[in-house]
Regions:
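N-terminal secretory signal peptides that target proteins for export/translocation
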Residues: 1-16
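Bacterial N-terminal signal peptides
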Residues: 20-31
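Sec/Tat signal peptide C-region and signal peptidase I cleavage site
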Residues: 33-37
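Short N-terminal segments immediately surrounding and downstream of signal-peptide cleavage
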Residues: 38-61
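Acidic/histidine-rich, surface-exposed loop or edge segments in extracytoplasmic proteins
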Residues: 59-91, 117-126
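Mid-length scaffold segments of soluble, non-membrane domains
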Residues: 96-156
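Hydrophobic/aromatic-rich core segments of domains that either
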Residues: 145-208
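Low-complexity, Gly/Ser/Thr/Pro-rich intrinsically disordered linker/tail segments
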Residues: 209-220
Length: 220
């Protein structure tokens, strides 16, 4: 049994493993009242209104490490190239968002020592600079807010993160979320499944919440 527990009475993930080490069950246990959950999912140290010259980055699982970093004007210009030409459709913009988020992760990885972050939780478990879905979803939401603030999202708005859990969807899992303003329909922007700097999953939130994983249907 492996227990990943944040400090100060925050929530805990319990992963129950079989003899081969594969995860059988993962249960999200609440410690204390809902305010404790809010502190864990939305740490107070995270900059809630980030700018390109001052934003937070979480890592080391459940945002146990939070640092402040910045993009220079030249860096910002380079990593936002996919979105600088307005996308003709929401679907095209989602593709551009995925490429932009990947570029942002690559650069942030250099700035924070998280370039070696592996997809999922187990591949890089115990190594410095690794991220779980709490780290990933906070960071992705920050990056999306930066894009929105700069007027680069023309078909979407950034929404609150979403968490899936239940008997048939596996361990609790959290993602960043955007909404197609014309549909309207919400989409998961999930950077957790793959290694740092790879294209994130962007797919309808309702499908994601049903327990989707990369070995299921294709995604954008």
């Amino acid at each position: 049994m492996i227990t990943l527990q944040a400090s100060h009475g925050r929530l805990r993930y319990l992963q129950i493993l079989n003899k081969s080490g594969s995860t059988l069950v993962a249960i999200l246990l609440a410690a204390g009242h809902s305010a404790a959950a809010d502190d864990w999912l939305f740490p107070a140290e995270i900059i809630k209104e980030p700018t390109a010259d001052r934003f937070s980055v979480c890592f080391d699982h459940t945002c146990r490490t939070i640092v402040t970093r910045s993009f220079s004007p030249g860096e910002w210009q380079r990593i936002t190239v996919p979105l600088q030409v307005p996308a003709p459709t929401a679907a095209a913009e989602r593709i551009a968002i995925s490429h932009t988020i990947a570029l942002m992760e690559q650069l942030v990885g250099e700035k924070t020592g998280t370039a070696g972050d592996r997809g999922g939780n187990l591949a890089g478990f115990g190594q410095p600079g690794q991220m779980d879905c709490i780290d990933e979803s906070n960071n992705a939401t920050t990056y999306l807010k930066l894009l929105q603030q700069d007027g680069l999202l023309r078909h979407h708005v950034v929404q609150n993160r979403s968490t899936r859990f239940g008997l048939f969807v596996g361990m609790p899992h959290t993602t960043a979320v955007i909404e197609d303003v014309a549909a309207p329909r919400r989409y998961a922007v999930d950077t957790w499944f793959f290694d740092n700097g790879e294209l994130p999953v962007i797919m309808p939130l309702d499908e994601w919440k049903s327990g989707w994983r990369p070995d299921d249907d294709s995604h954008e």
